[in-house]
Amino acid sequence: MNSNTQPASGNFHQSELDKFAALANRWWDADGPQKPLHALNPVRLDYVSARLDLAGARVLDVGCGGGLLSESMARLGAQVTAIDLAPELVKVARLHGLESSVQVDYRVQSVEDLAAEQTGSFDAVTCMEMLEHVPDPTAIIRACARLLKPGGKLFLSTLNRTPAAFALAVVGAEYIARLLPRGTHHYKDFIKPAELAAWLRNAELQLEDVSGMLYEPWRNRARLSSRTEVNYLAYAVKP
């Protein structure tokens, strides 16, 4: 598939793609609309690198956006393929990679389409802050599982569907502190860890860990936490 064509898979909300595409030009601005994501990125990277030797690993970053995590993993030696359905974001990611001299294979492609082409090709797949933005997150997980080699690792992050998550990630972050643009998140699409665990089992993946991720807006820092009420990370393995 040409890396700039519209994907065949329809597992996306066009309104979501448009919303994030509008942020493309400031994706790499650490003080811009994606400021919290910049704070979360080192935590995500540490979570992955603690469980996977990135040097030489073939890694797929699903829903890569402007390439924050993709570039970070490539800097640690991973051979990264990164996909997103928003052409504007992929363009920004490619340009930033050129400016930073970091090599990542960026594509406008769905994970479902890629799974049909490259089954069992990757040592690891990352899918961060994406599942809560698609109509069928279970299809994303199944496609990620297909793309993994036996023994391959899947890393996920998402938002829990709890009153705390609604208060902090929606009301607090979008309407009070205005850390994120309004409409970034939809509470009904948040995912409980038990739901995620069931989806992983159905995809024949073994859940190994669930860890909370705490964002401290007053310091603009994030860290791992034992509390999973708002943001959390998960790690699963393909037998």
Swiss-Prot record:
Alphabetized NCBIfam families for the sequence: UbiG (TIGR01983)
GO molecular function: 2-polyprenyl-6-hydroxyphenol methylase activity; 3-demethylubiquinol 3-O-methyltransferase activity; polyprenyldihydroxybenzoate methyltransferase activity
Name of the protein this chain belongs to: Ubiquinone biosynthesis O-methyltransferase
CDD domains the record matches: AdoMet_MTases
Organism the protein comes from: Xanthomonas oryzae pv. oryzae (strain KACC10331 / KXO85)
SUPFAM superfamilies: S-adenosyl-L-methionine-dependent methyltransferases
GO biological process: methylation
Function comment: O-methyltransferase that catalyzes the 2 O-methylation steps in the ubiquinone biosynthetic pathway.
Enzyme class: transferase
Biological pathway: Cofactor biosynthesis; ubiquinone biosynthesis
KW S-adenosyl-L-methionine (keyword) present: yes
Encoding gene (name): ubiG
EC number(s) per entry: 2.1.1.222, 2.1.1.64
Binding annotation for S-adenosyl-L-methionine: 44, 63, 84, 128
Gene3D superfamilies from the UniProt entry: Vaccinia Virus protein VP39
